[in-house]
């Protein structure tokens, strides 16, 4: 049992860091938008922005041996569409799970269901305000 979700963060190099949450599916876009908003001062530095967003998502569960995991260029157990944050392009996109070989992120379709501006994503799903 669980409510498994994966969150993909594209680094400046094009590689991806994937955050897996065993119980992270409920309100996943709102939680991600809040985390991305907290990282807004560092959106121009994918390493820092990803660290801030991941820290916000994991919150107080850093000491737990279960519940959260980090992967590189692959998703794991999944029950939802997959959100992708691209810091360099400042975009948010949503992808389907796809186990076909040849995908950039193993287990996720290369083709987005839709893409939107990262600021617009935060404004739509978060209570946080974006600094201008």
Q: Whereabouts are the PLM-identified features?
A:
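Cysteine protease-like catalytic core of ubiquitin/ubiquitin-like
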Residues: 29-37
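Low-complexity intrinsically disordered segments
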Residues: 36-132
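A broadly conserved detector of short glycine/acidic/proline-rich loop/turn motifs that flank catalytic sites
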Residues: 13, 24, 98
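Short, solvent-exposed aromatic-acidic interface loops
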Residues: 17-30
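Short acidic-glycine loop/turn motifs at beta-strand connectors
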Residues: 10-15, 87-89
């Amino acid at each position: 049992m669980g409510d498994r979700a994966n969150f993909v963060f594209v680094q400046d190099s094009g590689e991806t860091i994937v955050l897996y949450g065993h119980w992270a599916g409920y309100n996943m876009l709102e939680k991600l938008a809040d985390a991305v908003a907290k990282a807004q001062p560092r959106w121009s530095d994918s390493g820092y922005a990803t660290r801030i967003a991941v820290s916000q998502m994991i919150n107080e569960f850093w000491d737990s041996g279960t519940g959260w995991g980090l992967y590189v260029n692959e998703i794991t157990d999944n029950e939802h569409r997959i959100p992708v944050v691209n810091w360099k392009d400042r975009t948010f996109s949503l992808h389907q799970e796809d186990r076909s070989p040849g995908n950039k992120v193993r287990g996720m379709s290369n083709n987005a269901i839709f893409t939107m501006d990262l600021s617009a994503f935060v404004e739509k799903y978060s209570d946080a305000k974006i600094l201008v």
